[in-house]
Amino acid sequence: RTCNKTFSDQSKICPPGENICYTKTWCDAWCSRRGKIVELGCAATCPKVKAGVGIKCCSTDNCNLFKFGKPR
């Protein structure tokens, strides 16, 4: 499986056994100015998250795209 990874401009091959791509989003103290923090990666199962954290999981190559807004 290949998934998009945080801080990478190319998709990466996931480690053996990690066949799920995910996009995790959440807010920090700067959310109103910078927008949500986004984490992209691979996992063996869809990660469990706390309240206030968004998660989207998928199981095809490079399916965890995230469109960032234009800088203000």
Curated annotation (Swiss-Prot):
Listed GO CC annotations: extracellular region
Localisation per UniProt entry: Secreted
Pfam families in alphabetical order: Toxin_cobra-type (PF21947)
A GO molecular-function descriptor: ion channel regulator activity
Tissue specificity: Expressed by the venom gland.
CDD domains, per the entry: TFP_snake_toxin
Entry keyword set: Acetylcholine receptor inhibiting toxin, Disulfide bond, Ion channel impairing toxin, Neurotoxin, Postsynaptic neurotoxin, Secreted, Toxin
Signal sequence extent: none
Cystine residue pairs: C3-C21, C14-C42, C27-C31, C46-C57, C58-C63
The protein's role, per its UniProt record: Binds with high affinity to muscular (alpha-1/CHRNA1) and neuronal (alpha-7/CHRNA7) nicotinic acetylcholine receptor (nAChR) and inhibits acetylcholine from binding to the receptor, thereby impairing neuromuscular and neuronal transmission.
Assigned protein family: Belongs to the three-finger toxin family. Long-chain subfamily. Type II alpha-neurotoxin sub-subfamily.
Name this polypeptide is given: Alpha-elapitoxin-Dpp2b
